[in-house]
């Protein structure tokens, strides 16, 4: 049961790239019902998976990645999502940010996933200086935020970016940080 939860979170994070959580949460129940295990998903074609995720952004690429990821989970990891971040990044569709999200959320690893909100907010409020890439941002944040707070600080920065420090019309007058 725990492995299913971990696999479901990994799939949801893969699907969330350039997509809203709301859309992902609307899409995943049917996907997980159709493919309740990595073994079941590994037997599916990308076209079959596409039918369940077509309302998600970039569904063709994500369907191919999910099928290949499930096959690799089964062949190389015994159907178990690896906890090692480097091993996670070997899976199709899993880059540094996705691996860091899974590491922080599932295993409480002291890492800082950097999405567009984290990148923007950390620069605006001065947690980073001159960072031009997500990796530079991640490394600066890991120096500037106590390590035990990194897994939750990621969520704080995302929420602040979604609701206060928005990209187009930041609510600086409502910001308790600025």
State where each predicted segment sits.
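Catalytic cores of DNA base-excision repair glycosylases
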Residues: 1-3, 7-178
């Amino acid at each position: 049961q725990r492995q299913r939860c971990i696999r479901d979170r990994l799939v949801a994070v893969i699907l969330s790239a350039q997509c809203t959580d709301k859309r992902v949460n609307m899409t995943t129940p049917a996907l997980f019902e159709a493919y309740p295990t990595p073994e079941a998903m590994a037997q599916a074609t990308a076209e079959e998976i596409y039918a369940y995720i077509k309302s998600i952004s970039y569904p063709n690429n994500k369907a191919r990645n999910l099928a290949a990821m499930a096959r690799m989970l089964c062949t190389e990891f015994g159907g178990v999502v690896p906890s090692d971040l480097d091993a996670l990044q070997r899976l199709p569709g899993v880059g540094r940010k996705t691996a860091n999200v899974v590491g922080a959320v599932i295993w409480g690893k002291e890492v800082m996933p950097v999405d567009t909100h984290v990148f923007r907010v950390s620069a605006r409020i001065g947690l980073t200086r001159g960072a031009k890439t997500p990796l530079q941002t991640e490394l600066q944040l890991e120096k500037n935020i106590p390590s035990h707070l990194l897994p939750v600080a990621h969520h704080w920065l995302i929420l602040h970016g979604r609701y206060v420090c928005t990209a187009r019309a930041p609510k600086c007058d409502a910001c308790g940080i600025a």
